[in-house]
């Protein structure tokens, strides 16, 4: 992999990981459309750690407060808002982790085709539009009860299907259970910390077992570019979300899905 390819693929990962348009779909599609060889497991690990570093850095104050309050609540059994949000993130992660272990091979074998990606891109794009139009949008992320967290957690499982978008489906579910746009996005990004962390650790395990040669320049480029682009993406997405809504992302998904159908049918 040359540096130009590393920069492009890292930008794709960084710019799509937190937008509701599916990073996995774009990373699958770019090599198909460009004719590039698969970027390899080591590069996948690099860009996952890059985006993980971005979200942890951006939400470092919130994550630190949540961790302290959660640990304190274990002793006092009197959780405050930050501790309850930490419990919500933990609960919201369990179904994804279990499903990832159970269905990983099935998904890798049968659900990574361009036509599957085209279908999920369109279907879940329309669902995002519906949720944005009809959701009550009256709650913040600190007012999530167990039932609403479970709905978002189960929705996140669908993100295992390429083209769905983890951020897209969790924001959609958040809007459907009454979160406002910013709260739905923030909770989605908090959920991404364990989600991306689990993916990075799983890929790291596979990388160590495979003992493949590593292009350290491409790896360093992937971490840096994906991390910086992801951080900027989070910042500007949250800044502009209430103003622009979800419609631009819905339109993008519909256009992308149609283009994929035309190309691969």
Positions of PLM-derived features:
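Multi-pass membrane proteins that catalyze or facilitate reactions on polyprenyl-/lipid-phosphate substrates
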Residues: 1-265
